[in-house]
Amino acid sequence: MRSDAMKTGLARAPHRSLLKAMGLTETEIERPIIGVVNAHNELIPGHIHLNNLVEAVKAGVRLAGGTPLEFPTIGVCDGLAMNHVGMKYSLASRELIADMIEVMAMAHPFDALVFIPNCDKIVPGMLMAAARLNLPAIFISGGPMLAGRYQGRDVSLSTMFEAVGAVQAGKMTEQELAALEDCACPGCGSCAGMFTANTMNCMVEALGMGLPGNGTTPAVSGSRVRLAKEAGMQVMKLLQENIRPLDIMTATAFRNAVAVDMALGGSTNTCLHLPAIAHEAGVKLDLNTFNEINRRTPQICKLSPAGSQHIQDLDEAGGIPAVMNELYRHGLIDGSALTVTGRTVADNVSGRVVSRREVIRPVEDPYSREGGLAVLYGNLAPEGAVVKKGAVLPEMMRHEGPARVFNSEEEAFAAIMGKQIKPGDVVVIRYEGPRGGPGMQEMLSPTAALAGMGLDSSVALITDGRFSGASRGASIGHVSPEAAAGGLIALVEEGDIIAIDIEAGKLELKVPEEEIARRRQNWQAPPPKITGGYLGRYARMVTSGARGAVLE
């Protein structure tokens, strides 16, 4: 056993004394030592209940003959970090999480690991660590929050962000906003729509790193606790059979995950996280692959923010196994990929029935013939830009309008709330990329304000930053190269015409080449916004959003 390095033999008597100091018996020390990575904290609704799942995981490990030992990691709540300096730290926390887990698992030689994440950057950070360490491992996520209820309809956090814009536009009163505030997020779990956290938890299942049900079983369900116990038991089987993350997270598994992502209409943040996880696994996954799979994979689900349904509806409809079976039956995913069940994707999903066809449509009758995400290219984004196509209104699939240029999210949000943005405009938010931000902030507040004001049908927004999975509308992010790296977005001037064609995958600045060359001669990179601390180091080491914003 790997853990023998800290517990077996004469020279390890001091080590055993330390283990005994924590109350471990000889029998417990002799058993396989299983690290339980707990992302619990009291800041994230999606993580507030994780200690209960940790205890269930430990029970499962013990039932299967192992000794569980728990350690923590950090987690940022993107909702609480939104629209202030805290959001600069969100994406950057992903690398910290992976690094911290590496430190703990290398300093203390566990035999296997159980990862317990739930929210936005914690899931990919843990998947990166799992690939890097390549110890037998399994994931059990915290599960989705139930949707709230307001005036007879389902609501969630995205409803709250859009309500801010509705109040500003006079479409909603502050009293109505306060009433909505009390019921939009009814309890624990990752925010209820197909936002980033739930998209990534579904990706855990699609990649094969979580048991069936991991992506959609509600946080408050007894089924989630049972799933945690099963995960604790299953990690012992993975250890016994020596099945490791790199046996599971293969090129085939990543292509399957992208196909599931397209079918779900998931968050654009998968275009950052899946390539970063693949990078750790030694698998090439770029935006061209996303584009290729998008072109052949129909969108068969349309959950909030693109539609009115939430993750609980997807769970009732059959969950990710039903979605994957729908794709598998039509040759859109590869059933031979191995999973943490010890069986293949085909074994796991074959025969899974769709019980609510209004939630999971047939491949023959999809919401759209292509996937829910699209990659755009053009002179504004030669390395690519990303849009949640499934959440764009039909009238905004093609748009041409004058640029309204802002050098920060804060400037843009103030202009939107000040009613300075008019129908037809293209809002440009730059110097918010991985390096320029630094940290590639999410632009949920600006996009939600536009939607709440009713401008999502006439205004587009492009940025070298990124978006929350709760954003909707013609919100085009990850523009690469970013402004701080000298990308063309840095040279856009107020009033320039920008042409967007999402169906054709085009993003163009309509300015003559001679004028662009003149502007480039006069352009100078602005000084870094932050030079010290972790963010300063991050800004110096981070790569393009087109590469997953990994560190080099």
Swiss-Prot record:
Active-site residues per Swiss-Prot or TrEMBL entry: 468
Metabolic or biological pathway, per its Swiss-Prot or TrEMBL entry: Amino-acid biosynthesis; L-isoleucine biosynthesis; L-isoleucine from 2-oxobutanoate: step 3/4; Amino-acid biosynthesis; L-valine biosynthesis; L-valine from pyruvate: step 3/4
UniProt cofactor note: Binds 1 [2Fe-2S] cluster per subunit. This cluster acts as a Lewis acid cofactor.
GO molecular function: 2 iron, 2 sulfur cluster binding; dihydroxy-acid dehydratase activity; magnesium ion binding
Gene3D superfamilies assigned to the protein according to its UniProt record, in alphabetical order: IlvD/EDD C-terminal domain-like
NCBIfam families associated with the record: ilvD (TIGR00110), PRK00911.1 (NF002068)
Protein name: Dihydroxy-acid dehydratase
Organism: Moorella thermoacetica (strain ATCC 39073 / JCM 9320)
